């Protein structure tokens, strides 16, 4: 199962959390680090050995026309849309135009996972892919019970993905931090530092 993951934020965290919660006996490949550009996705695909049950490929865009190329390369069985925000907005006339570009990842994907809280993405997905695709709204599952909204939504996406794959909800208690993404570190004088340098 090839999984394409896109969104303004959360691509790498969702990818890493899926990888960290993979059931025993399921061989999984994931694109390294944040390899989500045209070149990064192509390099990731070349690393797949072929006997994996799940291959997680990030797809990031910054310009119009990029997602059509990524969709042809990745050809996902499952498309995951993590979020919709203002990243790379300067290259698009409107949020809707950027959203339409991102939605191209799911053009031929039989199954689509998204979070209903992100508009206009959720409405556009339901309208554009109403037929011929199975849509799964992650807002309808419990998630991991995280205190911050971004982590909770990411956990709901991960849980929904595993349910789509016919697996039970994962145990989020064993998750390890993803480097430079809300990573909590010990500081001096009994302080805590939150390293979100990547974002």
State where each predicted segment sits:
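Short intrinsically disordered, low-complexity coil segments enriched in acidic
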Residues: 1-7, 55, 70, 142-143, ...
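Single, functionally critical "micro-switch" positions that shape active/binding sites
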Residues: 11, 153, 195
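Phosphate-binding loop of NTP-binding sites
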Residues: 1-111, 116-127
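Conserved phosphate/pyrophosphate-binding and hydrolysis machinery centered on Walker-type P-loop NTPases
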Residues: 35, 60-61, 151, 175, ...
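Acidic, Mg2+-coordinating active-site environments of NTP-dependent enzymes
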Residues: 78-192
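Short, glycine-rich nucleotide/cofactor-binding loops
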Residues: 193-199
């Amino acid at each position: 199962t090839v999984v394409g993951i896109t969104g303004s934020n959360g691509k790498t965290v969702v990818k890493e959390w899926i990888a960290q919660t993979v059931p025993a006996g399921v061989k999984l490949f994931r694109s390294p680090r944040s390899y989500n550009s045209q070149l990064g996705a192509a390099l990731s695909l070349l690393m797949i050995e072929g006997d994996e049950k799940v291959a997680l490929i990030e797809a990031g865009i910054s310009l119009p026309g990029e997602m059509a190329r990524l969709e042809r390369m990745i050809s996902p069985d499952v498309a995951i849309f993590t979020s919709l925000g203002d990243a790379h907005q300067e290259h698009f006339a409107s949020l809707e135009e950027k959203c339409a570009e991102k939605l191209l990842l799911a053009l031929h994907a039989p199954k689509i996972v998204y979070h209903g809280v992100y508009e206009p993405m959720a409405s556009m997905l339901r309208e554009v892919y109403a037929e011929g695709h199975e849509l799964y709204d992650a807002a309808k599952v419990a998630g991991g019970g995280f205190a911050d909204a971004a982590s909770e939504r990411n956990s709901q996406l991960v849980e929904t993905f595993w349910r789509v794959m016919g697996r039970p909800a994962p145990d989020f208690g064993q998750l390890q931090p993803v480097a430079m993404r809300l990573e909590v570190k010990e500081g001096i004088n009994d302080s805590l530092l939150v390293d979100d340098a990547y974002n």
